[in-house]
Amino acid sequence: LTLDETFIAFILTVLNKKQSFIYETKAWRIVMSWIGVCDAEQVQEDFPFSGNVDGKEIGVYLIDGEYYALEDVCPHAYALLSQGFVEDGKVECPLHEAVFDVKTGQCLHGPGGRNLNRYPVRVFENQIQITFVEETVA
């Protein structure tokens, strides 16, 4: 059983107004909550924030006034992407030059091999928060 994009958008709309969300049917249960990653001031254009959230390395980027959160480990070389070069909405792996689109997680060039998971982001009381509905680009 999979969740379609419309339903995920609905959940995120509800969740954006609350701290947590629970949805149950006879077949499945969805429990989502916002998790604090960092303060908004810790993320600057061209200088992303990197942190471990619930055992996952997460990179938070500020691009054109919007925040984006991606898995922070390069799928090819396992380097922290947030330590790479950030320009024009793209991040380059510091080891082998794989390039990813920060807004979508899409691998644009190099040996990355796959797209990155991205995570819904909100700013709540000056704190960057994410939730783990993993979104990947097909």
Name these PLM-found stretches.
Residues 99:
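Short helix-to-coil "ATP-lid" hinge immediately C-terminal to the conserved N-box Asn in the Bergerat
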Residues 1-31:
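N-terminal amphipathic/basic-hydrophobic helices that include classical n-h-c signal peptides
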Residues 19-88, 102, 115-138:
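N-terminal pre-ligand scaffold of iron-sulfur
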Residues 74, 93-96:
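Short cysteine clusters
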Residues 88-94, 107-116:
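Short cysteine/histidine-rich metal-coordination sites, predominantly Zn2+-binding motifs
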